[in-house]
Each structure stands twice: as structure tokens, then as C-alpha cells.
Amino acid sequence: MWELEWTPQAEIQYYDILSYWVEHNGSNSYSMKIMKEVEKSEDLLMYNPFIGQEHYLSSPYTKIRRLLVLKHFSIIYRITDKVEILSFWDNRYDPKKLASLIL
């Protein structure tokens, strides 16, 4: 089993998205759904970190991977001696912004 670590930036993105959906919907039901799916994704990554698709931002030196969560979100991560989550990304955002955040 691999160790999993969220970067501070990824944690902020994750909690910002959860907060947005609580405010937007006036309830926490969709945020709870996101949280459950993220927990499932974390379990998958700890046991099989290569399950995510190689991301287009990868290079020969930095292999960046992406795991889809609920169609609209992605966990962006890299594998070193652990699984390091670099970003929790809303796929509707501008992809150019993602590159500036993780590279």
C-alpha cells in the first residue's frame, strides 16, 4: 500500500470546491457526495496508483496522472516514493490555469 499525501494547495482547492457547492445548493448533500467519491479514489490510489491516466502535462521527468471523480472533478497527482496529490481540479476550469498551478 502506498502512502498518500495532499499538498496544501490541493487541500485548499478541495475545501474551496466543497464550500462552493454548500453555498450554491444551500445544502451539503452534493459536497458529501464529492467527499465520498474522493475517499473511494484515495483508496484506489493507495492500492493502485497507476490506475490514473497519464496527464498531458507529463514530461519524461515528471509523470503527472489524473483520476476522474464524478465526471466534473479530477485528482491530479504524481508518484514518487508516495502518491502526492497536486491538485483537486474542477474540469470546467480553464486548463491553462492548471498548468500554471502544478508546473
Predicted regions and their residues:
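Enriched for short, Lys/Arg-rich terminal
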Residues: 69-103
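Basic/aromatic recognition patch in beta-strand/loop cores that engages polyanionic ligands
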Residues: 51-81
